[in-house]
From Swiss-Prot:
Gene3D superfamilies for this protein: MOB kinase activator
Residues noted as binding Zn(2+) in the record, renumbered to the chain: 82, 87, 164, 169
Originating species: Mus musculus (Mouse)
Top-level taxon of the source organism: Eukaryota
SUPFAM superfamilies: Mob1/phocein
This protein's UniProt keywords: Metal-binding, Zinc
Protein name in UniProt: MOB kinase activator 3B
Biological processes per GO annotation: regulation of hippo signaling
């Protein structure tokens, strides 16, 4: 990453503290292997494939946390331009509106300004990945039976961040010179969720044309 990009993607812009893996754990080793593959310039399609002999849940857990960190950082770079005035509803253009629902305050799908939606989303994901019952960090502790379903929901909601950034704020990304970095992150995300079958195709529709050009 260039010096300019490092200034754009600095830790002060991050929405949340990064979640890290404990050194010495299996997931830490998988994370290192995944990062090494990316840094070596290997084909992203190949980089997301489950390594032989590795557990699918571990592989998914590593990537979910990594994508949360990366997408959180991307949104953090443009969040000052994403306001209740500029983005009164969380959307992806005129055809797609995303409503927030959780088990706490918003029991029914509710239209919210994009920055409020993003805050709730990042808070919600942070709770999931810091929950030892869902993302266990101790060796030998099994993942819950509904682990992949939870990850699908996390990744589906993270995809909506890409949709909003690309459709409503990509001009800022270009001004900051971060276009290539964001595109690479998106391609990595897209190849992973399609390789592991973690997002329904209909959810990917808002960026279908761009994805066809970018991820051919």
């Amino acid at each position: 990453m260039s010096i300019a990009l490092k200034q754009v993607f600095n830790k002060d812009k991050t929405f949340r503290p990064k979640r890290k893996f404990e050194p010495g754990t299996q997931r830490f080793e998988l994370h290192k292997r995944a990062q090494a593959s990316l840094n070596s310039g290997v084909d992203l399609r190949a980089a997301v494939q489950l390594p032989n002999g590795e557990d699918q849940n571990d592989w998914v857990a590593v990537h979910v946390v990594d994508f949360f960190n990366r997408i959180n950082l991307i949104y953090g770079t443009i969040c000052e331009f994403c306001t209740e005035r500029t983005c009164p509803v969380m959307s992806g253009g005129p055809k797609y509106e995303y409503r927030w629902q959780d088990d706490l305050k918003y029991k029914k799908p509710t239209a919210l300004p994009a920055p409020q939606y993003m805050n709730l989303l990042m808070d919600w994901i942070e709770v999931q990945i810091n929950n030892e019952d869902i993302f266990p960090t101790c060796v030998g502790v099994p993942f819950p039976k509904n682990f992949l379903q939870i990850c699908k929901k996390i990744l589906c909601r993270l995809f909506r961040v890409f949709v909003h950034v690309y459709i409503h704020h990509f001009d800022r990304v270009i001004v900051m010179g971060a276009e290539a970095h964001v595109n690479t992150c998106y391609k990595h995300f897209y190849y992973f969720v399609t390789e592991m079958n973690l997002i329904d195709r209909k959810e990917l529709e808002p960026l279908k044309e761009m994805t066809t050009r970018m991820c051919h």
